[in-house]
Design a protein with these regions (language model features):
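Conserved SAM-binding loop of SAM-dependent methyltransferases across substrates and taxa
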Residues: 86-99, 115-116
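Class I SAM-dependent methyltransferase Rossmann-like catalytic core
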Residues: 2-74
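Class I S-adenosyl-L-methionine-dependent methyltransferase module
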Residues: 101-142
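Conserved class I S-adenosyl-L-methionine
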Residues: 75-85, 103-106
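N-terminal cationic-hydrophobic initiation segments that often serve targeting/anchoring roles
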Residues: 71-72, 94, 102
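Conserved SAM-binding strand-loop segment of SAM-dependent methyltransferases
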Residues: 142-153
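A short acidic, Gly/Pro-enriched loop at the edge of an enzyme's catalytic core
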Residues: 152-163
Length: 163
């Protein structure tokens, strides 16, 4: 697999989480129309989900290569992802080290206006939908028994040691 299979809704969430994956034309549209219109209109109707799937896969694979040698394939069994988006990086890990368990802690809403960065301020923004995330993981090869998703604002968070 050299790309992720993305529905339009999944591609939208990927773009809201990783703006660098959009085309130069969409970057110009975003700059011209502003973040609110881009978030609520352009990302719903003008994304190429196939191209986003290719770009997202490449970005996650490149990231995986930076720490691949730090994972012990025999000992590391439980992976924790906090605010990791849809889980593309975890899918790459799963392709290379199958049969692990993944725990995702995410917020479950999509902000009206995208705000990127940290800048020392409290960031109450979120760009995820946990049902869409689960469907994305399953459609791209992660088995349901490997997936544990927690809503940061509503669920009791996991209390165990992670690898």
């Amino acid at each position: 697999m050299k790309n992720f299979i993305l529905s339009n809704n999944e591609a939208r969430l990927v773009v809201l989480q990783r703006i660098e994956l959009i085309s130069p034309f969409l970057k110009k549209l975003r700059k011209f129309f502003g973040r609110t219109l881009f978030t609520n209109f352009v990302t719903k109707y003008f994304l190429n989900s196939n191209q986003i799937g290719i770009s997202y896969y490449a970005a996650m694979h490149k990231e995986f290569l930076t720490f691949q040698n730090s994972i012990n394939s025999d000992q590391d069994q439980l992976f924790l992802s906090i605010g990791g988006g849809l889980g593309g990086l975890e899918l790459i890990i799963n392709q290379n080290l199958p049969s692990k368990k993944y725990y995702f802690i995410e917020r479950n809403f999509i902000s009206k206006k995208v705000k990127y960065g940290w800048g020392g301020t409290i960031n109450n923004e979120a760009y995820n939908d946990l049902e869409i995330q689960k469907r994305f993981l399953e459609n791209n090869g992660m088995h349901n028994s490997q997936i544990n998703i927690f809503d940061y604002d509503k669920d009791k968070l996991p209390d165990q040691k992670f690898d």
